[in-house]
């Protein structure tokens, strides 16, 4: 029986944040990303939201032995859903593919009490840069809603548990894209 795969569209695109080695760039149709928060976490995070006619880049990776326990724990604020729409990838052996998304009735827009963490944005952008180059980073920003939410600048003392060290050019790229989308970056 083939291993199932997950479709990651945020921090899971950054291979440095997980150990799922059998991974491939992928695109899924019918979805966008949005910044949301729930009562399950003190800060905002990305979720996938249905969006007819839209497509987002991401990463699919095998879940060996159908063992979802560690990934479900990491993604505890999300529900796991089967991917039923068009999915494009080069994985020769992908079984069923699942996507994590927050149920709309359990989420709300980010606010000052539930900001987006810059250290989280850094991780996601680093992943997209490594998988898709600068064009992929631009597509990430363009296919994600909620950049008007407060972004807490925690870069010097990262709060995000899977934060990564960014090179100076990666930081400049993140900062330039945040300016381009008129993001609201606030001091920590």
How would you describe each model-predicted region?
Residues 1-188:
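A glycine-rich, hydrophobic/aromatic-adjacent loop/helix-cap motif
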